[in-house]
Amino acid sequence: HRLAVIASFFLSLAVIASYFISVYQEMNTPKVDIVNTELPKYSPNGEKYLHDTINNTLENGFYLWRNIAEIELVTAWNKASNIPFYAVDKRGQEIKYTIYRYMTSMGLRKDANSLSQLRRGDVIRIENGETTYLKYNLFEKRLRSLIFEFQQYKQTKNPNNQTLIQRFFYWKIALKTFSKHWFFGYGTGGYKEAMSKEYKMAS
């Protein structure tokens, strides 16, 4: 019985690890698509596209930071939604980036023409903070969110706005600060100043 429990435990771990690896690989594999391979200089409305070819973050296999015509997108979005482009969505995220991620997940360029292809239901989902048009169960949604945070941290080296990574980063700073003066401490207000110095050194 004990061997069966142990075998079942390791089998479960193997299944979870295999699932994680498959999701991670899928999230890091760009699709062979014209949106990824062709980088036009201008949008159909004449705005110059932003193409960041250094940051290779993907959303559903499409590059997030390419094909961006923000000026015309602001106008188009503000006509489609009551939440302004530079405000936050209903989850407290900057809706600008929610729009970028959602449109990218659909394989669309981030311009006015592409925004016009969104249905009312898509606009509502973006307003509610959904970053992809694909629907996942709660476990996979959280897993993909954590992988995305890790990808962003790898690209930018900035732990801010990455919930789990940000916690680990500040715990690491706190432990490092504490270890330097664990016996005598820092005195009144000194700990915050020491934490701030460690943060600047680590950033």
Model-found features: residue ranges?
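Membrane-interfacial entry segments at the cytosolic side of transmembrane helices
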Residues: 2-12
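Membrane-interface motif at the C-terminal end of an N-terminal transmembrane signal
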Residues: 16-28
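Alpha-helical transmembrane signal-anchor/signal-peptide segments
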Residues: 26-41
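Extracytosolic and intramembrane catalytic regions of membrane-associated proteins
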Residues: 38-147
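Long extracytoplasmic/lumenal interhelical loops at the membrane interface
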Residues: 85-123, 127, 154-180, 184-203
